[in-house]
């Protein structure tokens, strides 16, 4: 994993591929002002899109895996952690978390769109090894913001893989998560010493500054996706609430 932001020319990223040669599995309306979320399939490959823009492709999940791995590394030595994941996606973040946390862990997944949960129990399940079947997992079909606003000192780690990061595409209310108020809610929902890990499709210097202003000890990490020597980079922020 590198903080280097350079990138070499190579084949187009998966989100540049046209959806025309993919088969429609299902489209659903995101609650509130979120528009239409579409699940597409081409052979064993799946794509989640909104407004014609790809949010996730099953061929590329290095940064989703890294989100869980980096958060877990910060909690080394803590047994039976309680973890909150905002956003289920295709289950890769959840699956990576289950691999890194012990048998006594409890992992709460907040997913606003109930059909995304159904897709993960159906056609998307095999992609990440059916993580929803793990007995450590509790699914709450609700906005993760409601959980953050209602709980204090509840979690050892909070992983936000919601929308497209601070520059959201799916649901306008997601923007609140990345404001000072949203970050303060996450800060207070963590145990002292707890970790907030945030996924984004791109860097955002102002967001890093907001994390630090809230009181987090925060760093920005760039994760290369696709081939090891070329491709795009996603951005992760790993932030710790001081003990």
How would you name each of these model-derived features?
Residues 1-49:
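N-terminal auxiliary segments of SAM/dcSAM-dependent transferases
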Residues 3, 7, 61-192, 198-201, ...:
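The AdoMet/dcAdoMet-binding core of the Class I SAM-like
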Residues 28-32, 36, 48-80:
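Class I SAM-dependent methyltransferase Rossmann-like catalytic core
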Residues 44-51, 161-166:
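Short, basic/glycine-rich phosphate-binding loops at helix/coil junctions
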Residues 237-243:
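C-terminal lobe and adjacent flexible extensions of AdoMet/dcAdoMet transferase-like proteins
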């Amino acid at each position: 994993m590198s903080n280097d932001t350079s990138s070499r020319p190579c084949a187009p990223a998966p989100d540049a591929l046209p959806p025309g040669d993919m088969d429609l599995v299902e489209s659903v309306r995101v609650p509130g002002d979120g528009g239409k979320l579409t699940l597409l399939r081409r052979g064993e490959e799946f794509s989640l899109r909104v407004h014609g823009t790809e949010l996730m492709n099953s061929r590329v999940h290095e940064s989703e895996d890294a989100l869980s791995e980096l958060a877990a590394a910060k909690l080394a030595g803590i047994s039976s952690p309680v973890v909150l994941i905002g956003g289920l996606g295709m289950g890769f973040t959840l699956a990576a978390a289950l691999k890194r946390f012990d048998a006594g862990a409890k992992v709460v997944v907040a997913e606003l769109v109930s059909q995304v949960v159904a897709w993960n129990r159906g056609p998307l399940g095999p992609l990440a090894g059916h993580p929803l079947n793990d007995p450590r997992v509790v699914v709450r079909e609700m906005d993760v913001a409601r959980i953050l606003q209602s709980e204090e000192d509840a979690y050892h780690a909070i992983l936000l893989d919601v929308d497209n990061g601070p520059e959201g595409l799916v649901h306008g209310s997601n923007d609140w998560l990345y404001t000072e108020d949203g970050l303060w809610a996450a800060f207070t929902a963590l145990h002292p010493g707890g970790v907030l890990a945030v996924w984004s499709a791109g860097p955002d210097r102002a967001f890093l500054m907001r994390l630090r202003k809230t009181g987090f000890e925060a760093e920005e990490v760039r994760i290369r996706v696709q081939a090891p020597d070329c491709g795009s980079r996603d951005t992760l922020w790993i932030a710790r609430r001081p003990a």
